[in-house]
Amino acid sequence: MARRATGQSGGPGRGAVKGARRPELRLPPLEPFRDGELEPDGDYDSLEFREEDLTGHDGGGARFMDCALKGCVLDETRLHHARILDSALTGPRGVGTDLAEATLRDVELLDARLGGVQLHGSVLERVVIRGGKIDYLNMRKARLRDVVFESCVLVEPDFGGARLERVEFVDCVVKGVDLTEATLADVDLRGASELEIARGVDRLAGAVISSGQLLDLAPVLAAQLGVRVEG
């Protein structure tokens, strides 16, 4: 169970941006999951899912509370509208996992290897995504508050129309991000080791970037402003 959340303001010289509050998970003793198949609107409390192959399972609308998922396969797993609370997901892998309109609160997602994850319309609050690689992450119209992306690789993540508040990118690679119509507040991009914005550079109001990132983004910013650079 998550008891407290810790906030990090970034320390001296990090500016006035408000740091994300991280979850502190304290899971109770867990029982192994033995049901074999996820069920729509199922209720899963204090369970450990260890190396379960959940390919194609339908857990739409299910609630996961104080759970640990370790090394599970999530190919085309349907978790639409699921609620994942006070839980840790370690080493999940899969393509096309459907978490559209799901709620993730006080969650750690560690060392994920995922592609085409659908999180559009989802709500993430006090979530840490650390390690691993996620390709083509769909977070269109999602709401992220107190979320940290740390030491991970994000390839072409789509935050179109999303709202990001107190979101940090720490030692991670962000390639081809789409910020079209996104709203940012206290978003700290300074820790991203690589930052490439494909669309929506005009939506950076509310974010903080480093001077080096500003130089890297100069061509994109100039193109957005219609400025021609010669010589």
Protein language model features and the residues they cover:
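N-terminal acidic, proline/glycine-rich, low-complexity intrinsically disordered segments
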Residues: M1-Q8
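Short glycine-rich, low-complexity segments
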Residues: Q8-R14
